[in-house]
Amino acid sequence: MCIRDSLARVTAVNLYFNEIQKLIFSLSMWRCTPSFSARARAILEEADKNPDGDVYEMRKRRNYSDFWRSIPLEEPYRVILAEVRDKLYNTREALQEVISGKRHALDPADESVICAKEQLLEPLMACYDSLKEVGDMTVADGFLLDLIRQVHNFGMGLVKLDIRQESDRHADALDAVTKHIGLGSYAEWDEEKRTAFLVGELEGKRPLIANDLECSAEVREVLDTFRMIAHLQKVCPGSLGTYVISMATVASDVLAVVLLQRECGGDPAALLNVAPLFERLDDLRDGPAQLKRLFSVPWYHTHIKGKQEVMIGYSDSGKDAGRLAAAWALYEGQEMATHVGDEFGVKLTLFHGRGGTVGRGGGPSHLAIMSQPPSTINGRLRVTVQGEVIEQNFGEHENCFHTMDLYTAATLEHTLKPPDGPVDEWRDVMATMEKTSCARYREVVFQTPEFNPYFIQATPGQELGSLNIGSRPSKRKSNAGVVALRAIPWIFAWTQSRFHLPVWLGMAEAFQQMKDDGKMGTLRAMYQGWPFFKVTMDLIEMVLAKADPAVAAYYEKELVEPSLHAFGAQLRQALKATTDIVLEITEHPDLLTPQSDTGGQGTYTTLADKLAMRSLYITPLNVVQVENLKLLREIEDGNPRPDWVPTWDWAKEMLGRYESNDLYHAVVSDTLIITMKGIAAGMQNTG
């Protein structure tokens, strides 16, 4: 049992304990059903013959606020709830022993403690049903119902921890298994053969993974993770949420995880729900077909009981194809996936893997939800909240409730009054622009020889990977290049230099093609009448307002070799072209300056004012960052400045254990990190 889960459970127990105390005080009525009265009588009789001593003396020693003496049968709800209070107290004591190392985990067989939320819900529901049956509806629907809802939603651990792993790691594990038992290489099988094998194993009962399996450390890690999942599901039910498969591409990716869960000791009736994460453009397009293939497997269709979670990735799709192409692929993918779910009678919950920045799908919560395709939410929504915006949206009590209000209101509004969908002409326009923008984006990023060295030199992307920033490695694999780079440092690097290239690259060509084809009026109509397109354009406009070509040019001048300067000038020209045509479509006189209702004079929005004020502080940080990037690269090239020696006595004393060059490197790195954090704070959404 992990410390994180134990601490979360202690917090939950304390919350529920206080609520139970209040309910014991308020539920003083005597009217109840005969079965409920019999239950209360049995509890009192058991307490009277308790071999461990006087129950009421024990309650007195625990310093309960009230009702520690014997409760009469005429107060049956208090009798039941007092027993629940005792169990919550016992649970808290047991969890404290787990945290201190005196015991390994809670014992699910111990009836004196509460391990699963069902154990707490059962007596509460018994109270609720009894009150309803005898006509005390006002009491039943008061604090008691509030507590039932809290327990139902938050369980005994408050927050469930999702598990996430790449699909290739599961394939490697199964490859080791099939080779060990003499079936050949799972990695070399086609999708048909993989699916047939997995379904056959899932329908059968034979053990698949041998105890003496010889495998690599990577495979052992995957199998150990599944064994830990099985263990936690037994001793800490409700602690884990969904198993997310990143870089999912085919139906067998999901079946593989279900099989590995079972074969590593998981209870077939309590396996984690498995959510494929479709991230790249081609995977988003093919995702609905793979869901159809998955739901067509009778065993799996029965296993999921009409519910399936699907995660869609905004980050890697944007990095793979550009923001415009990714946005349209996500829109169409959600529509088609929902239709597949309806076809097979499966309620689909879409899990939106959004980042904090527009390049990774970020944006205002309410607008983002309302711009989703009609009939794709239906009262169910999951969304990631990035660490960089957690404090902003949930850091204070008022902000937290305001954010939850926005999510709830938007989800209900979208469900009860879905936004209008696009007409066929608008779909055709988007399909054409998707192809054009994607082709241009990929041409520049993946096919232009100058791009990779320019990116490495003109941004702090390379340095980000070596600094202790972020929760994940900057690259998925050790090989160099943009392809291996994760979406977060990809966006982060361009945001630091104020270029924001991943958001707008390829759009100018797509919009210009429509303009040349006489479709400017159509684009303006789309902006005025289609929530998806309007939100997309407004977010792009916001990012363009945050961009500063002069700052980007300064990074280039100071950090990039002269042979690449012409390429940088082309990119800045593309940024200007994007800005011009976006303003032409939105009919705004300037960025973040909508037309005034009177006289056509622009009025700056609050955001524009904030950006103008922040720029006074961010630009000096950019200058300092450039200087420290130069210094750090000199160190890495083996040419540190030899005359650098600290002159302050306190610095010499505190950092005296370092060699001079190590100290120099530490100071430069720390300064660089400070500039990164400062620019990130000014930009608000960075990675």
Question: Language-model segments: which ranges?
Answer:
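Conserved catalytic alpha/beta cores of large enzymes that bind or transform nucleotide phosphates
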Residues: 9-107, 310-318, 341, 346-348, ...
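Structured, charged N-terminal subsegments at the starts of enzyme catalytic cores
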Residues: 69-275, 279
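C-terminal structured domains
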Residues: 277, 289, 318-327, 333-343, ...
